[in-house]
């Protein structure tokens, strides 16, 4: 499906962009730039936990893996580690659990390990059966970067950079992340530019998620063909639109079982 959409866009001349709002979020873009510039040395290990307490009545609890925590939440750490390592993984391993007391008829918690060609490792957990939590860190030969919160919107993101025994805390104001990605895409259309998070970027994530599926089904690590993605997040993509006020939900509800 990814390749069909990429081909259709190329044939028609349409602009195709994956709506990855964090590709335009200032804190995320700044941290990726620091790691890319060598501030923490060669990146070695990425770790992340992303979880929520999903209500069993929510539609995402009804369709197994396809609506489960990996496709819903796991794509965030998958995309982040690919950007920080500046490479594509070559091996995928995964394990999963079902917490019987949670009432979800699916693997509600999944742990994934990605091996990168430069011996970098990414390890993350995505879960529908834990308290709401989001965090990631990347540790390099000379330092580390850590985010908490990491993937959400509605708050200003911040992170710590630790090098040489010193910690530099960087805080960024809240932005309208959805407006930022829309403005970026509008510029691409108006100025006839190719979006950075294009169809290929989405395909790179989907092929990893599908490898996670196979790893869970077989109980074995899955090998991915080496692949070189040439485009990555650039500093110029950071968008600083001011946040808007609270928006009323229409025919929707909070997916958490802890919602009031």
Where would I find each of the regions flagged by the language model?
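Contiguous beta-strand/loop segments that form the cofactor/metal-binding neighborhood of enzyme cores
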Residues: 72, 78-156, 172-175, 179-193, ...
């Amino acid at each position: 499906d990814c390749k069909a959409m990429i081909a259709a866009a190329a044939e028609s001349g349409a602009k195709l962009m994956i709506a990855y709002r964090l590709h335009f979020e200032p804190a995320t873009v700044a941290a990726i730039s620091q790691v890319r510039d060598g501030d923490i040395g060669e990146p070695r290990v990425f770790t992340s936990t992303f979880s929520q307490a999903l209500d069993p009545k929510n539609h995402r609890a009804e369709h197994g893996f396809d609506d489960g925590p990996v496709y819903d939440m796991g794509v965030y750490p998958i995309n982040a580690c690919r950007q920080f390592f500046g490479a594509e993984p070559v091996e995928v391993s995964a394990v999963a659990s079902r917490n019987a007391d949670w009432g979800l008829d699916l693997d509600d918690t999944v742990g994934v390990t990605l091996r990168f060609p430069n011996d970098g490792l990414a390890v993350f957990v995505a879960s529908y059966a834990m308290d709401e939590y989001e965090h990631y860190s990347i540790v390099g030969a000379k330092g580390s970067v850590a985010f908490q919160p990491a993937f959400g919107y509605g708050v200003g993101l911040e992170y710590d950079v630790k090098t040489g025994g010193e910690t530099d805390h960087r805080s960024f104001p809240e932005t309208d992340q959805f407006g930022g990605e829309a403005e970026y895409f509008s510029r691409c259309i108006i100025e006839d530019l190719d979006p950075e998070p294009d169809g290929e970027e989405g395909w790179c994530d989907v092929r990893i998620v599908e490898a996670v599926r196979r790893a869970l089904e077989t109980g074995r690590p899955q090998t991915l063909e080496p692949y070189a993605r040439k485009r990555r997040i650039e500093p110029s993509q950071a968008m600083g639109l001011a946040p808007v006020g609270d928006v009323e939900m229409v025919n929707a509800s909070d997916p958490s079982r802890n919602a009031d």
